[in-house]
A protein has these predicted regions:
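Conserved ABC transporter NBD signature motif
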Residues: 61-76
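Conserved ABC ATPase "signature" region
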Residues: 100, 104, 110-125, 176
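Helical segment within the ABC ATPase nucleotide-binding domain
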Residues: 168-179
Length: 179
């Protein structure tokens, strides 16, 4: 049934200047299941995720989250949390300031900032400049940002890229616990 499909992608295609990077993609994701895309660099994985959350317009086809396009949600961060680029932070802004900025821009409580910093284990470094974070701490900050709206769905693009085995294990266990 439709309620058992959290993400539905139908005939999704994306072409840039005549080069097709995603071609007639169809899939469904059910709630509570950790699902991944596998493929070589340039296969269209990131582009697909960007189309799902409305950052790239498909050439054709549709992507729906819980039956609706991402753009139709009045408070989208409460439906979908995304980590598409962990380096998307102002390097001179503290972790807490970055999250407060995102929360304020989306009408969310500042109280939630402290909660998500605790969830991802960054409370002790919340006042530190994000530009000084290690790769693993940057990934955790990206996850904290994705969790701000307490979303039903998380879309994470390469959340373990470049992490050491301990960091990979932490992200894997963290995501499994959320599912």
């Amino acid at each position: 049934t439709a309620l058992e499909r959290m993400i539905t992608v139908s005939s999704l295609t994306k072409a840039y200047k005549g080069t097709t990077v995603v071609n007639d993609l169809n899939f469904e994701v059910t709630p509570g299941i950790v699902t991944g895309f596998l493929g070589p660099n340039g296969a269209g994985k990131s582009t697909t995720m960007r189309m799902i959350v409305g950052l790239d317009e498909p050439t054709q086809g549709t992507a729906r989250i819980d039956g609706k396009p991402y753009a139709d949600y009045k408070r989208p961060l409460e439906k979908v949390g995304t980590l598409l680029d962990a380096k998307w932070v102002h390097p001179n802004r503290s972790a807490a300031a970055h999250l407060r900025w995102v929360a304020a821009a989306n009408g969310m409580s500042k109280k939630r900032v402290d909660e998500v910093l605790g969830i991802v284990g960054l409370s002790d470094v919340a006042g530190r400049k994000a530009g000084k974070f290690s790769l693993g701490m940057g990934q955790r900050l990206g996850l904290a940002c994705a969790l701000l709206g307490d979303p039903e769905v998380l879309i994470l693009d390469e959340p373990v890229n470049g992490l050491d085995p301990e960091g990979i294990r932490w992200v894997r266990d963290f995501v499994r616990a959320l599912a």
